[in-house]
């Protein structure tokens, strides 16, 4: 309304993005090209932002971020202490692009990894890259991703499946939801790469129905990818075909377990299956299936584009890369953080999280939320 009143609708574009991560200071507005960010913005502030910043080029000081320790004014979001020790790989596009426009994903190398894989790499080449990167499953078990994919590739079958486990059942967890809401095309691209690698032409994203924004943006992203020829027949003229469908879960906690998830997709009660056989050998509808969670998949396009050595340069000797955490509870900076593996819990709580409110002593932290 304020833009219309000041005849700025053709000059200023408002873009809805995914989560920036610093939830404690939200809602956050970033104004480009200066990249000035305002925090805790309310509808009543719109008039001031338009009149002062957009028209007169003057910063709205009361909406600027003040460092709690130094009292310094910080204009750039990534200059705040919250981001100093973070390394955004899985979250790289969250808050940076409009997730409902595939063109903005293209602008940040979107689908280049898929194009490279289907036109230049063999299936074994992709597995070798994943092995060198050291990527392990981010869903909890930490199983090497290349090994899971290798088992499925080696399984002989007329049909194979790729599944994204987006059934984030732990109370207080919103890591996967934020990626789906902020960067859905990254998951689609990664699943297509997985399909090429194991020889699958069909994938399913299993997401709980309680995530309406994520579901809507995934539907939009899948439709856009099909329209651009990035899902469907003969992708990039390579002869490789792959398509995706959504399956909505009813919110059962047990369906976060991969075999219970398979049962749910098949239309049965979500109950875990005895193993072996493992899904990579006998999974969805009795066919070889790989199940990866959202965060695991979000890393894959970057590993292809920047190289496995780049990814392996973060983290520890046995745990490469980064890990996303939902930071909540009695802490200054609640939100979403992505840090290199090996970062200590104290660094997360005190350096990134800003410590305990009112200067109180840090006594305990529980990882994994109420479910442990």
Regions flagged by a language model, labelled:
Residues 1-5, 24-56, 144-155:
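Iron-sulfur (Fe-S) cluster-binding segments and ferredoxin-like electron-carrier domains
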Residues 12-33, 134-144, 253, 363-371:
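Local cysteine-cluster metal-coordination motifs and their immediate loop/turn environment
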């Amino acid at each position: 309304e304020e833009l219309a009143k000041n005849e700025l609708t053709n000059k200023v574009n408002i873009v809805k993005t995914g989560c920036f991560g610093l939830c404690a200071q939200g809602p956050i507005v970033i104004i480009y090209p200066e990249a000035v960010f305002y925090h805790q913005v309310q509808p009543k502030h719109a008039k001031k932002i338009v009149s002062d910043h957009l028209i007169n080029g003057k910063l709205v000081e009361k909406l600027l971020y003040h460092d709690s320790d130094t009292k310094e004014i910080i204009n750039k979001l990534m200059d705040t202490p919250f981001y100093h020790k973070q390394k955004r790989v899985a979250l790289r596009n969250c808050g940076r692009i409009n997730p409902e426009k595939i063109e903005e994903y293209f602008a940040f190398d979107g689908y280049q990894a898929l194009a490279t894989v289907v036109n230049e790499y063999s299936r074994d080449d992709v597995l070798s890259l994943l092995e060198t990167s050291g990527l392990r499953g981010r869903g909890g078990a930490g199983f090497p991703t290349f090994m899971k994919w290798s088992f499925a590739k080696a399984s002989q079958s007329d049909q194979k499946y790729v599944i994204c486990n987006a059934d984030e059942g732990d109370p207080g967890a919103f890591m996967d939801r934020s990626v789906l809401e902020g960067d859905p095309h990254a998951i689609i691209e990664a699943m297509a790469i997985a399909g090429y690698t194991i020889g699958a032409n069909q994938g399913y994203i299993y997401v709980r129905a309680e995530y309406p924004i994520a579901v809507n943006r995934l539907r939009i992203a899948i439709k856009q990818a099909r329209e651009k020829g990035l899902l469907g027949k003969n992708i990039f003229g390579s002869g490789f075909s792959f398509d995706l469908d959504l399956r909505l879960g009813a919110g059962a906690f047990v369906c976060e377990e991969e075999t219970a998830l398979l049962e749910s997709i098949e239309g049965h009660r979500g109950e875990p299956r005895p193993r072996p056989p493992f899904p990579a050998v006998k999974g969805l509808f009795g066919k070889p299936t790989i199940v990866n969670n959202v965060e695991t998949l979000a890393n894959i396009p970057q590993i292809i584009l920047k190289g496995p050595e780049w990814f392996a340069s973060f983290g520890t000797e046995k745990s490469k890369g980064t890990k996303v955490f939902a930071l909540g509870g009695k802490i200054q900076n609640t939100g979403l953080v992505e840090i290199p593996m090996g970062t200590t819990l104290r660094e997360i709580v005190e350096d990134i999280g800003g410590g305990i409110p009112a200067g109180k002593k840090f006594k305990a932290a529980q990882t994994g939320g109420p479910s442990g």
